[in-house]
């Protein structure tokens, strides 16, 4: 069983940074910064950023799509808290998260997507104290679809004969363990993420990429836990997980189960 994680520095695609200044928005009193991932239409980009700033986040890294709109320069001037990362080449989910973690400055990084909304307009200082106290590699949120129904986002390992299976269920109890962060969403300990080697950029399928990270965290004695107070709502349907046993599954299997 291969438990040696890749380092985040093993692959560094080129990119341009617009706005902000590395570490300029972080201060000791607010331990969480934001990593905003983007997909699909960008109709409400400005509103999303404004909402995050209004909640109180002082440092936001936005991972942009290739060939993104010219409005970025205007947004960068309006929101000095935001640094826009413009990749020069296509990159899978893990690569984008790895870059965002390197570019973030806080000890904890809240990863979410542009098609999600915070279900609360404020996050209390008590909640951030809990983030520190739980000492988890990642705290995953309650996820609801556009109708308000809970997404089965908590993953549990199961065994069927000699086969390894993952069973997704809706969250039940605060602090409940999950095998991996659904849709890569959650509040990550930046230090633990770095020590674990981040996401394996050689695994292109996001499902096996996230599962590989979760298995590695477990093998290294770290935990991924559900935080009931953290809630996100999807604007539309949540993304479907592609669990096809493809070549990426083969790499995951050899690294974690062989």
Q: What spans do the regions from the language model cover?
A:
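Active-site-adjacent helix/loop segment of glycosyltransferases
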Residues: 219-258
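Glycine-rich, basic loop-to-helix element that forms the pyrophosphate-binding segment
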Residues: 87-104
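Conserved donor NDP-sugar-binding/catalytic core segment of glycosyltransferases
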Residues: 117, 121-155
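N-proximal low-complexity "stem/linker" segments adjacent to membrane-targeting elements
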Residues: 1-50
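Short, flexible, basic/aromatic active-site loop/helix in glycosyltransferases
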Residues: 157-179
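Short beta-strand-to-loop acidic/aromatic patch adjacent to the donor-nucleotide binding site
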Residues: 107-117
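A short, conserved alpha-helix in the catalytic core of glycosyltransferases
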Residues: 180-188, 192-197, 203-230
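Short, acidic, metal-binding catalytic loop of nucleotide-sugar glycosyltransferases
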Residues: 50-59
């Amino acid at each position: 069983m291969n438990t040696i994680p890749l380092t985040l520095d093993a692959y560094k695609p080129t990119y341009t940074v617009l706005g902000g200044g590395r570490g300029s928005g972080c201060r000791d009193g607010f331990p969480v910064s934001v990593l905003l991932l983007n997909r699909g239409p960008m109709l409400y980009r400005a509103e999303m950023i404004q909402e995050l700033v209004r909640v109180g986040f002082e440092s936001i890294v936005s991972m942009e799509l290739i060939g993104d709109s010219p409005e970025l320069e205007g947004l960068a001037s309006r929101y000095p808290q935001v640094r826009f990362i413009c990749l020069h080449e296509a990159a899978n989910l893990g690569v984008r998260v790895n870059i965002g973690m390197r570019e973030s400055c806080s000890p904890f990084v809240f990863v979410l997507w542009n098609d999600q909304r915070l279900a609360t307009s404020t996050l209390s200082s008590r909640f951030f104290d809990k983030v520190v106290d739980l000492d988890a590699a990642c705290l995953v949120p309650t996820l609801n679809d556009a109708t308000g129904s809970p997404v089965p986002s908590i993953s549990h390992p199961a065994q069927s004969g000699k086969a390894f299976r993952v069973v997704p269920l809706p969250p039940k109890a605060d602090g409940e363990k999950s095998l991996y962060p659904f849709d890569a969403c959650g509040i990550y300990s930046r230090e633990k993420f770095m020590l674990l080697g981040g996401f394996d950029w050689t695994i292109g399928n996001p499902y096996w990429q996230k599962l590989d990270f979760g298995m590695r965290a477990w093998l290294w004695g770290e935990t991924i836990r559900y935080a009931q107070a953290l809630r996100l709502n999807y604007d539309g349907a949540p993304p479907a997980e592609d669990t096809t046993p493809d070549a990426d599954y083969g790499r995951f299997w050899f690294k974690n189960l062989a």
